[in-house]
A protein has these predicted regions:
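N-terminal leader/propeptide and maturation segments of large enzyme subunits in energy/redox metabolism
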Residues: 135-143
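NTP-dependent small-molecule kinase module
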Residues: 75, 128-129, 145-200
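ATP-dependent NMP and nucleoside kinases share a basic, alpha-helical "lid"
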Residues: 66-135
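Hydrophobic/aromatic beta-strand patches that form the interior of the parallel beta-sheet core
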Residues: 6-8, 81, 108-110, 182-184
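Short glycine-/polar-rich loops that comprise or flank the Walker A/P-loop
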Residues: 3, 103-108, 178-181
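Conserved nucleotide-sensing/catalytic segment adjacent to the nucleotide-binding pocket
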Residues: 3-67, 73, 79
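Conserved protein kinase catalytic core
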Residues: 15-17, 89-90, 119, 193
């Protein structure tokens, strides 16, 4: 049998909120320093070394945190798909001089691109959709936004985008675009409009 395993998102390798808070970087979740890169590299090393069984952390978007009592079991996949905004980045943190990067373990990489105005629109639309659904759950980390009006919701989403997502996009994500083997350009309707393949 041919088995494809998706190791969910690299969010599973974020540090828990407790550690991020202790380091004063909870508001930088999604930036390079918020990931346990060593743990992710160890996982990929084990996969490439032929070890068959792997247990990886699970991230909950509802609780906005790593679930301490939950894990994902990956067993001997023929193809392993690792997805995340950080996976093509190189380590540039002070005091760290890793010569091995996450992307070194990839046989093929894909970057999904879109115009920034479309990304902003999608983010605001998704935030509003979640405000009316998942944010209503009292256990949700974002329950504090549940009673926002439509206009307040849009303003809050745009503020979060401007203060967190936009800097991360421009400083850390976009610069990795041309490190990918394949670039898919999406239009405002989410359909792929162009495909670029890096020639070797």
């Amino acid at each position: 049998n041919f088995f494809i395993s998706i190791a969910r998102r690299s969010n599973g390798f974020l540090y828990p909120n407790k550690i991020l808070s202790e380091r004063g970087i909870l508001n930088r979740k999604g930036f390079m320093e918020s990931y346990d890169t060593k743990k992710l590299l160890n996982f990929l090393t084990a996969v490439k070394s032929g070890i068959n069984t792997h247990i990886v952390p699970v991230y909950s978007h509802l609780e906005y945190d790593i679930l301490p009592d939950d894990t994902l079991l990956i067993q001997n996949p023929d193809i392993l798909i690792v997805e995340g905004i950080n996976v093509l980045q190189v380590n540039s943190q002070k005091g760290q001089s890793n010569k091995v990067f996450v992307s070194d373990f990839f046989d093929f990489s894909v970057y999904v691109d879109a115009k920034e105005e479309d990304i902003i629109e999608w983010y605001i639309s998704r935030f509003e959709s979640l405000r009316a659904t998942a944010f209503q759950d009292p256990s949700s980390y974002f329950h504090k936004y549940a009673n926002l009006t439509l206009e307040e919701s849009k303003q809050m989403a745009f503020q979060i985008w401007t203060e967190i997502n936009k800097p991360n996009l421009h400083n850390n994500i976009l610069p990795t675009k041309y490190r990918a083997d394949l670039i898919l350009q999406k239009g405002s309707n989410h359909f792929v409009e162009s495909v670029k393949v890096r020639m070797i």
